[in-house]
């Protein structure tokens, strides 16, 4: 139990720190802290000029949705990067239990995604002059954490795909685009075709964004518990599927004695 806990905590943190091994950590600021603010401003001003939704609508949608950048790219890089640096094979031949090994790498990503979303939400609100009720801040923090958890589950699937795709950044960008369009971040789900709104129910962020907007409008945490439960379920399904894919690809790699099957 102690060994598993150490693998979960120390292994995950070490792997996350390795993301910045070759790059100066200062790249974190424009990528994770500045870019989401400009995304929020872009859609907010488009909405203003077109007379569509309020600044609050675009603020909440884009702040939460931008958590997909750290969640998708970091999870893929943790596996794909170790594969590229030839350390993944040494990890996979170790007797370490796989659940703490893989999910331990997810925890720093989850926390980072939640931080990016929370930072974007607060700074974006200050820039746009959006008032968020003080009573909604703590519930919104919980929603942000759940949203990051849900997308980290999808990121685990993305990480598994990096064992078969050489340039996973392309796939990560495609998934980011789908989440931007389908989750209601910028277009209300009742304004899109039925099949899109149906598909959105199985995607990260959809329920979290809806819950956050209700909380900002004055709803209580109890009023959105159904939406939060749905978001947790979506994240759990993606997480289990991602872990299963990683294990299956590991078995295939052992069978063919190589990780290079892409």
Regions found by a protein language model. Name each.
Residues 1-262:
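Hydrophobic transmembrane alpha-helices and immediately adjacent juxtamembrane helices
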């Amino acid at each position: 139990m102690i060994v598993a806990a150490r693998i979960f905590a120390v292994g995950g943190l070490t792997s996350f720190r390795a993301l910045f091994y070759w790059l100066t950590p200062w790249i974190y600021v424009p990528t994770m802290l500045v870019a989401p603010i400009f995304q929020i401003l872009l859609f907010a001003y488009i909405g203003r000029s077109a007379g569509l939704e309020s600044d609050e609508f675009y603020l909440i949608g884009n702040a939460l949705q931008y958590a997909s950048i750290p969640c998708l790219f970091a999870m893929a890089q943790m596996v794909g990067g170790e594969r590229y640096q030839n350390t993944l094979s040494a990890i996979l031949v170790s007797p370490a239990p796989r659940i703490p090994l893989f999910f331990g790498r997810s925890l720093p990503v989850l926390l980072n995604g939640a931080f990016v979303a929370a930072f974007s939400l607060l700074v974006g609100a200050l820039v746009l002059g959006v008032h968020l009720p003080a009573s909604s801040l703590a519930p919104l923090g919980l929603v942000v954490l759940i949203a990051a958890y849900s997308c980290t589950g999808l990121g685990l699937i993305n990480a598994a795909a990096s064992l078969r795709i050489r340039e996973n950044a392309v796939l990560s960008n495609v998934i980011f685009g789908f989440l931007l369009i389908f989750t209601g971040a910028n277009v209300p789900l009742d304004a899109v075709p039925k099949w899109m709104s149906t598909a959105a129910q199985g995607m990260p962020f959809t329920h979290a964004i809806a819950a956050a907007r209700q909380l900002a409008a004055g709803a209580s945490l109890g009023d959105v518990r159904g939406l939060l439960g749905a978001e947790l379920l979506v994240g759990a399904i993606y997480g289990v599927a991602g872990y299963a894919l990683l294990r299956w690809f590991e078995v295939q790699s052992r069978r063919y004695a190589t990780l290079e099957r892409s």
